[in-house]
Each structure stands twice: as structure tokens, then as C-alpha cells.
Amino acid sequence: MITTQKTARLPKRAQVMRWMAAAMLPIAVVACSTEELLKANYPDQIEPAGLSTSLQGASALYAGAIGDFTVAFSGSAAGGFGQVMTTGYMTDEFAFGGTPPEIRQFDLRSVDASNGIGASTYNGLHSAREAAVRAAGVFKAIAPTDPRGGEMKALEAMLIVLMGENYCSGAPISTTTPTLTYGPSLTTVQALTLAVSTADAALALAGANAQVKSLAAVTKARAQLDLGQHAAAAATVAAVPTSFVYYVKHGTATERQKSITFTQGYNSHSFLVSNKEGINGLDFATAKDPRLPVDGSGAPSDFDVVTPMYFFAKYNSQDHAVVVSSGVEARLIEAEAALNASNPALWLSKLTEARVPYSMAAPADPGTAAERVDLMFRERAFAMFATAHRLGDLRRLVRQYGRDPAKVWPTGAYHKNGLTRGTDQNMAVPATEKNNPNFTACINRGA
């Protein structure tokens, strides 16, 4: 409420004194530096130097790194497909119900090195890694006991795991901290070994924070599993509770925060759950598995008028969460270690533990070694659907279990346009990486 009040008339002497005080104001102004007068103070903003010297700056870097990781991992409606979508298309998880050829290349498993979506996805992964590196370094320098430093290191490790799992052997890792240094090409084994040591650094920085310790442990074990170190991987996650979940979350405040998987799925009808894709694909859309809720009747997409419309119901809003790492994954890692140790009883026990959060009955032992491997990877596929695990798992089926690629990957005739699927088993490093003088080409495009 605004009120008005009349001003009383001042005595003559008081009027004179007020006039003298007012007359002195210009003198005071002249006595001040004009630079100081024009320098605005914004207490809610951080000067660039403060990013690396204050806890407030470290917190800002942390928030930025989480945002960059979310975009690199799960994409953004503002642009950037992320690892979830690109690997989902390349495997049997998702079918493309649209028409743009650059996206279709992923679903065909025939991605050109000049593909713009491939380049932005790859660049996003490395930008997020560098953001995590910088934030972790600042926390280590000014607040070494803050568990967020360990969290940043764990996310750095996760991004290296994703590079090792999803890209060809020979992808380099460069750094911009403190200055730009071009990295050499790394084999898949070298990249995953680096991920293990980075996760170890995260564990050392986690302190007593159970959430960060579990994130770092599952990330390390995932890399160990990729390296074929099954027993070591199981030991790494032994203390991780099944209830553990680490996730990132989209939002609605800005376009960058919004979910591209929702936009391309429920809105555009192009990012669609697959069903027995390319002969070898699993029955994701029709299995009625509680771990993989599906919307849609299977009617043709409104976009291409061909692809059956099934939507992943966990990603049914612009602000959904995406699981990055979990205790369920820890139990599945232990199960696979037991399978490789020829201990089917323990294997089934661990599979059952991984089903508990979904109130599912224990699985039956199929009996043969090959069928047990099939069940192991089916359990992983449904429990970790659309979380950027499947491409690495299909590669492991070929690399570690000796499966024929033609019997693992979606193959044969494409479901539209009269096209035939390609033979890519990973994503190529984009042509833009040739700016790096240490990189020439992928070393190996196999599993």
C-alpha cells in the first residue's frame, strides 16, 4: 500500500543548512573515481576468476557439468541426440519412425563419418567430460572433502566408459584443462582401462558419501565387465545396495533442459520402441515386461505411416528422469560373474535379486550354457532399457562370448524404403576429429 504525507515547512535556518548540504554533493561526486562509480556490484554473479577460487564458483561449475552430462547422455530438445538415442537406434531398442536420412543412418547401422548428428553427439560427450574434469579439479583444490568432487570424477569416468563402449577403437581423448592438448588415439582396451583408473580416483574423493561411492563403484565395474574382468567387477560392486539409483533429470525451464526422447517419441512419433527388429531383435514392445512399460497400439506412425508406434512410457514427459547407474546393474554384474565362474545357482540368485524392485518372480534356469547367456543378456536388456547399455552389450556378445555378429545385431532388410541394414558394430569417430593431428581414422570397426 502506497501512502502520501505532506512535508512540514522548515524553519529558515534549517532551510539554509539543507541548501548547504545539497550544494556540497557535487564536490563529493567529483572527489570519487568515475571508474568506481560506474562499477556495478552483482552479488548473484560470479566473476570468471571466482569459478576456480571459491566454493560458489565450484558449485556453479558442478551445476553446469551436470547439465552438460545430461545433454551428452540423454540429449536435449534444443539439439543434441545424446548416447541414449543414438545407441538406441543402432541396436534393437528403438526403430525410426521418421524420414530424415541423417537419423535413419543410425537405425540402419550405416553411419557416415560426416553425419552431423554423429558429430554433435560425439562433441557433446567430450564437452561434458571436460566440464566434469574442470569441476572436479576445482573441488579438489579448494574443497577436497566435498563429495561433489568425487561425483564429477565418477561422471568423467562414465563418459569415458561410454566412449569405449559406443565408439570405434582409436577414439582420442583430448583436454582443454588447463590448455588445449590433443590426445592420441586410444584402443578400446586403453579407453576402458582409463575409465577404471578414473573411477578409482572418484572413489578416493567420495569420502563417506554412499551415493557417490556407489556411482563410482558401478561405473568402475561396468568398465571392468567390458574388459572381461568379471570376478573383479563383482567384487567392486559387492557393497552397492540394490536400492541405489543415480539418475539425471530433464526439466521444462528451458529448451535445453527438455527431453528430446519425449519430443521425438510422443510428439513426433519417430523414436519408437522396437519389436524383434531385424530378425535378431528382442520383443521389447510386446513382452509386457514390468521393467519396460510401453504405450501405443502398434498402429503406423503418423510421421512415416509405416513404423509401428510403441512409446517408452518411462520417458513420457519433458521432465522425466533417466537412470545412469543403479544397484540393479550391480546385481546383474554379479550375476554375470557367477555365470562365468560356472556357478548357475548363484547366477540365478543374483538375477532374482535384480528383479525384486519390479516385484517379478525368479527366472527359470534354461539349462544350457548358450541359453543361460541369452537369458543373462535379456535380463540386462530389459532392466537397463534406454540407458545407453545395449550397444556395449551387443559388442560384448561378439567380443567376449564368440557370437556371430549376423546373429546378434539387427540385420537384413530394413522395415521401409527398400533399404538393407549395414554392418556397423560401433559409432565411427566423426570427420571433425581430424582437426586433431594425432588422429587419422578408427583403428578397428569390429566389436
Language model: regions and residue ranges:
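Sec-dependent bacterial lipoprotein signal peptides
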Residues: 2-30
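Long, repeat-rich segments with strong aromatic
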Residues: 308-346
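Short acidic-aromatic linear motifs embedded in glycine-rich loops, typified by GG[WY][YF]DAGD(H)
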Residues: 33-151, 158-162, 166, 170-192, ...
